[in-house]
A protein has these predicted regions:
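Active-site and donor-binding regions of nucleotide-sugar-utilizing enzymes
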Residues: 1-90
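Short, well-ordered alpha-helix to beta-strand connector turns
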Residues: 23, 72-74, 94, 179, ...
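A donor-sugar binding/catalytic signature common to diverse glycosyltransferases
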Residues: 28, 186-228
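Short glycine-/small-residue-rich Rossmann-like dinucleotide-binding loops
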Residues: 31, 81, 135, 204, ...
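A nucleotide-sugar donor-handling region in carbohydrate enzymes
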Residues: 54, 59-60, 69-136
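Short, charged/polar "capping" segments at the starts of alpha-helices
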Residues: 59-61, 83-88, 140-141, 167-174, ...
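Short loop/helix-cap segments at secondary-structure boundaries that form the rim of catalytic
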Residues: 68-70, 86-94, 168-179, 211
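Donor-nucleotide binding loops and adjacent catalytic segments primarily
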Residues: 112-198
Length: 228
């Protein structure tokens, strides 16, 4: 599907959903509001558009684009960030957003104990366990996954837990031989974070604001491509 057709399709799908649910507000959580999202708002004068615009953007020239995108919104919400003091990106000096507390699915009261979390995930209670959340896709991201997994080879009796199979787009494994790997599906993962002795995670908003409050010793690996 071409980009133009996709934008039209997204607009029409959103408008149909708004009509079906009688929604009054459309919320976009992302870096760049898609043309289809903007088109949906422009096609329905009664629809309010809210942009959940996270901070810590890369320090790249925005010219007029950021201001134009922001002006199209009825409201902008910026989720707080534990690293906000180090935000020197183009949104850091803007005064057009409502700042909230950091948003996280981790709640101490809801988090399982180490024992219960390991039972829920089917893990050995006594072996060391590491969570790896790095994603896959482009070659540079795949290389980081392979490097991270290779670095764990010397850890005796280690259980390595992933939320996605470590394979490239062609189905080739990114993991070295000699690791005990397990892919888990559990939501919300924040409730079972006490199962892990350590983590290797992409520096995404959700990962940072779940693993840090859960006090899981974690190596955060940044991806500076594109809008990441």
């Amino acid at each position: 599907m071409s980009r133009e057709k996709w934008d039209i399709y997204l607009r029409d799908r959103l408008l149909a959903l708004v009509e079906e649910t009688n929604a009054k507000v459309l919320t976009f959580d992302g870096v760049v509001p898609y043309p289809g999202v903007i088109a949906a708002k422009n096609s329905n004068p009664n629809l309010k558009l809210v942009w959940v615009r996270r901070g810590l953007w890369q320090k790249k020239p925005q010219r007029y684009v950021l201001g134009l995108q922001s002006a199209m919104m009825d409201k902008i919400i910026e989720p707080g960030d534990v690293a906000r003091a180090y935000d020197f990106g183009p949104t850091s000096t803007r005064k057009d957003a409502v700042l909230t507390s950091p948003v996280s699915l981790f709640r101490k009261a809801d988090a399982m104990s180490r024992e219960d979390a390991r039972k829920a995930l089917g893990l050995d209670q006594n072996r060391p366990t590491v969570l790896v959340q790095l994603g896959t896709g482009d070659s540079d991201v795949n290389e980081k996954m392979t490097a991270a997994l290779s670095g764990l080879l010397g850890w005796k009796d280690l259980q390595v837990i992933l939320t996605k199979a470590p394979v490239d787009k062609n189905g080739n494994t990114l993991a070295p031989d000699g690791l005990d790997l397990k892919v888990v599906r559990y939501f919300p993962l924040a409730n079972v974070l006490h199962a892990f002795d350590a983590g290797i995670c992409a520096t995404g908003y959700n990962g940072v604001h779940e693993l840090l409050p859960a006090q899981v010793p974690t190596v955060f690996v940044s991806n500076i491509r594109g809008t990441d």
